[in-house]
């Protein structure tokens, strides 16, 4: 048994699944099924551990695609149980005919509590911070906008197992502002914000706000480049060096709490805007469409995840915000998602701000 457990769980499960079902379109050319001559023995092991169920094939593909490896029989059983619950959630949600679809992703073997601990980190009351200072002009706001088409939106990043979403929202806004101002791209240090911005009421891997990060950068004199101060995804001591500054902040502009008209004006005419919203349990499996929810809140105390609004539009008669996430390019729609516009859905316009670079 110990020899078998040292094998990747994905190999064990895919071997079993390939033999167990022909009607699901399993790729017969997959070389993984040739790993061992002891196919029947491996099948017996998997069945002994997990039992025969309709979820085994899906779990096998999941473990293989995301390189999941489990350290013991007990852990495999636990993760399979969690996976089944999440798969049932995805399937039941997709049957409701909603404006969005869910799909299995790298989070499918995590409980909701684990996911919250690893990925969310903007759960603070921002009402005292965000007194609106954005000025609406008479300029015509475009019907649709996608700042990616202007080439100023930096690539999607991955925050890892650290509640540092607020740092990625911050750097995303600054990278876009820098590119817009100076005509070239830049990658900025999230890790400096994790390590150094605590005096401005931020808490590293345990949360923070872009508006407070902008203030830190302004008074600190700048933010280092990613190359000079690379991301580790862990809290650490501050290693800021003024000689490695990539950008400086002259000021930051806040959107009035809940004012989607102001937010649309800013996103449409100025540049991408840092926003925060409440992630509810089904959102982590978002794949495409316009996300909407009747369970999320929209108060300053509800928001728990900071992201970057890079545009807006309409899909199947549903207006939406186009938003860049920090969960990697494989998540969602190539790292992006759409959130319903016009209802301050999940608080998307509750904590919004953007920087002015020097």
Curated annotation (Swiss-Prot):
GO terms for cellular component: cytosol; vacuole. Pfam families: Inhibitor_I29 (PF08246), Peptidase_C1 (PF00112). It catalyses: Hydrolysis of proteins, acting as an aminopeptidase (notably, cleaving Arg-|-Xaa bonds) as well as an endopeptidase. Gene3D superfamilies: Cysteine proteinases (3.90.70.10). PROSITE patterns: THIOL_PROTEASE_ASN, THIOL_PROTEASE_CYS, THIOL_PROTEASE_HIS. One of its GO terms (molecular function) is cysteine-type endopeptidase activity. Glycans are attached at residues 125, 254. It is found in: Vacuole. CDD domains: Peptidase_C1A. Keywords: Disulfide bond, Glycoprotein, Hydrolase, Protease, Signal, Thiol protease, Vacuole, Zymogen. This is Thiol protease aleurain-like. It comes from Arabidopsis thaliana (Mouse-ear cress).
